Amino acid sequence: MLYENIKKLVQYGVETGLTPACEKNYTINLLLDVFKEDEYVEPEEEYRDIDLEEVLNALLDEAVKRNLIEDSVVYRDLFDTRLMNCLMPRPAQVQNEFWSRYEKDPQEATDYFYKLSQDSDYIRRYRVKKDQKWTVDSEYGKIDITINLSKPEKDPKAIAAAKLVKSSSYPKCLLCPENEGYAGRVNHPARENHRIIPITVNDSPWGFQYSPYVNYNEHCIVFNSQHVPMKIEKNTFIKLFDFVKLFPHYFLGSNADLPIVGGSILSHDHFQGGHYTFAMAKAPIEKHVTIPGYEDVEAGIVKWPLSVLRIRHKNEKRLIELATHVLEAWRGYTDESAFIFAETDGEPHNTITPIARRSGDMFELDLTLRNNITTDEHPLGVYHPHAEYHHIKKENIGLIEVMGLAVLPARLKEELELLAEYILEGKDISSNEKIEKHAAWVAEFLPKYDNLDKDNIQDVLRKEVGNVFVHVLEDAGVYKCTAEGREAFMRFINKL
């Protein structure tokens, strides 16, 4: 069995282009060594169209049988990453191939690198496809919803083992370039099959890679080669446009640099981008504005639940200057009547979530105004999902959500299935502790629907989840989409 599966894995490497045919013997020997095996008899059968997940599972079962690893998802993931690295080209080979394709066409280079990141199992296609995805129509356009199921749940044994591992600061975090080739440990994922493309932005060395969890098409991460914290400043806008000039078919955005309104990693300066058009990018300008000193720059308030100023120009340098002006003005801006405070007790509250893209021959920058103030009524944030929506989403509204994609917790899959059953059978939702938190929400929307049955219940639940997410985005908007909110927004713009 071992020989068969080794042959299949090597054949997969050759078929996908990870492994040159002339390196077959070399690769077989690397794999034998991982299994502490010094014999090999080539199976006669030829294999085609190999199912990677199947082959890896068979090899992992073999490793468990030989007591090479414990049988748990954490140890299996560490081990199969090591197996995949035996098939992989070295980092310099990947970089050379990338840049030689880039000379012909930047998109050809990213296509190659994206395919490699999937073929190598760094992006586990068979897990990513478990994610549930749908769209919901809203007054702001088609909103994307995804329930993230591609991150495996850790088992209790591995969690206990992770607690016993002495803490390490190598690599400092999951975004550090030192992850490339790292074997991992019980509390840090293996990254042996991970490859990074070095790029230069704002005259400094950065890295370009894909997210292993692919929330949308070609979801990439662009990160500082130094472990330095997130900071929104003039240089941020320069870096965003440097990248968009390198890869005109990609957008790139940054999470805000303050807690609550920022992303999950504030400790390492990074951006996220990709080859995807979000609802926010399609949203039209609701009101055109002219900013003194920047009359040549197209500017306007976007029809979007968050408060977004879109600026456009053929010369990105004009956008960098204007964005810096807006950022500095917003950082120091207070409007008590609109409950906008630049700071309280010396703690700053105002920042921006910026997103840069090409639009034909124009450069475009969306500046999303953010504020992280908290109150007794809203201890997690005034401009953050309010408590009534926490049953669906209570995590931060980061860059991806700002653009119109809800990344919802895995628990919702089971909860929505249970809700469907309880609604159709007329059972009391509040009697089940897993779904009681949804009872008030269901009671509110149920009267809108007459003939619910097993064929339409999931569609109704998905639509209502989408409606909740739109409300969550409205909560995160510092200026509401009302006459009063727009008036307050214009007060800020007139200060520019």
Segment roles from a protein language model:
Residues 244, 248-264, 273-334:
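Catalytic or ion-translocation cores adjacent to nucleophile or general acid/base/metal-coordination motifs
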Residues 1-229, 303-305, 319-323, 329-405, ...:
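Active-site microenvironments that recognize anionic phosphate/pyrophosphate groups
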Residues 239-243, 325, 468:
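Amphipathic alpha-helical segments that form well-ordered structural scaffolds
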Residues 206-211, 236, 240-244, 290-297:
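Structured alpha-helical segments in the cores of large, soluble enzyme domains
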